[in-house]
Amino acid sequence: MRVVLLGPPGAGKGTQAQLISEKFGIPQISTGDLFRSNISEGTELGLQAKQYLDAGDLVPSEVTNKMVEARLDEPDAAAGFILDGFPRTVDQADALAAMEEARGVTIDAVLEFRVPVEELVQRLLGRGRADDTEDIIRNRLNVYRDETAPLLEYYQNVLQTIDAVGTVDEVFARTSQALGR
């Protein structure tokens, strides 16, 4: 099973990805984790990513795409994976489609986790991170909306929307149902 998870910061993608990974025995692939591991291992891609992250910039798609592709080539991803935080743009979705085509596979499901904006703001404020002021959070949500909205159309044939309000178990029940399991 090959699954893409979409949703704004605070929607619970990481939590749901972890549960899907445990239930179906497929790896959760998070771009944040890929950045951290490549940086800590001192890989060429990690060094490139670090320059952008240290400057407070987004890592360019070219670097992110190469990291994801290398991760998809690892043996544990052969039977399936969950992508959490990738793709974020149509360009990245096109790159993923090319990776799939090269491997003779397709994405089985794209799940969009929806949560009302005010709920997201409260969830993110509740994390207690120093850099999570309400203004910064609202800006992150706007950036997400603007850059990711075109993906909803891109994936319209495989997209399923999940109501991500409720307990972790309630949302996972909806997620499992959407995956047909």
Swiss-Prot record:
Residues 30-59 are annotated as: NMP. It comes from the Bacteria. Keywords: ATP-binding, Cytoplasm, Kinase, Nucleotide biosynthesis, Nucleotide-binding, Transferase. ATP binds at G10, A11, G12, K13, G14, T15, R127, G166. GO terms for cellular component: cytoplasm. The keyword Cytoplasm applies. It catalyses: AMP + ATP = 2 ADP. It is found in: Cytoplasm. Its EC number is 2.7.4.3. AMP binds at T31, R36, D57, L58, V59, G85, F86, P87, R88, Q92, R129, R140. Pathway: Purine metabolism; AMP biosynthesis via salvage pathway; AMP from ADP: step 1/1. Residues 126-132 are annotated as: LID. The keyword DNA repair does not apply. GO terms for biological process: AMP salvage. It is an enzyme of class 2 (transferase). Consists of three domains, a large central CORE domain and two small peripheral domains, NMPbind and LID, which undergo movements during catalysis. The LID domain closes over the site of phosphoryl transfer upon ATP binding. Assembling and dissambling the active center during each catalytic cycle provides an effective means to prevent ATP hydrolysis. Belongs to the adenylate kinase family. Catalyzes the reversible transfer of the terminal phosphate group between ATP and AMP. Plays an important role in cellular energy homeostasis and in adenine nucleotide metabolism. Monomer. This is Adenylate kinase. It comes from Mycobacteroides abscessus (strain ATCC 19977 / DSM 44196 / CCUG 20993 / CIP 104536 / JCM 13569 / NCTC 13031 / TMC 1543 / L948) (Mycobacterium abscessus).
